[in-house]
Amino acid sequence: MNEHNIVRVRDVMTPDVKTIDRMQTVAEAIEMMRHTGVSSLIVERRNENDEFGLIVVSDIATKVIGPDKSPDRVNVYDVMTKPVITVHEDMDIRYAVRLLGHFRISRALVIDHMRPPLGIVTLRDMVLRHGQSS
């Protein structure tokens, strides 16, 4: 793969990120996921010095539904992953795949130098795109 064939994270990310406040309930997160058709939500920062979080369907399954807790009584901050792993929009997807593989995770938040969330990138998206460019 030469310089002209490099696929960047921005080329495969899902740009429309859905966010949720950490104080909202897991029931609200489930409803938002159902309504928007996503399986993960970015948890907003409390302030500029805070980090983003991530809540995914598997978190809800293993930390709320499996242990038979009420989604109405559990807050997002109780089950989210924080800080979320981030990748820069200009990163070559080969390096992003390695990073996610190293941490055994399936998705990362995409940021730029200003750090607002630009999108979500998944291993699935990157692997399928890499197969097209080879």
Per-segment meaning from a language model:
Residues 46-50:
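Short, solvent-exposed loop/turn segments that connect beta-strands within catalytic domains
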Residues 1-15, 52-85, 92-105, 117-134:
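Tandem CBS (Bateman) regulatory domains
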Residues 20-38, 44-45, 87-105, 111-112, ...:
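The conserved cystathionine-beta-synthase
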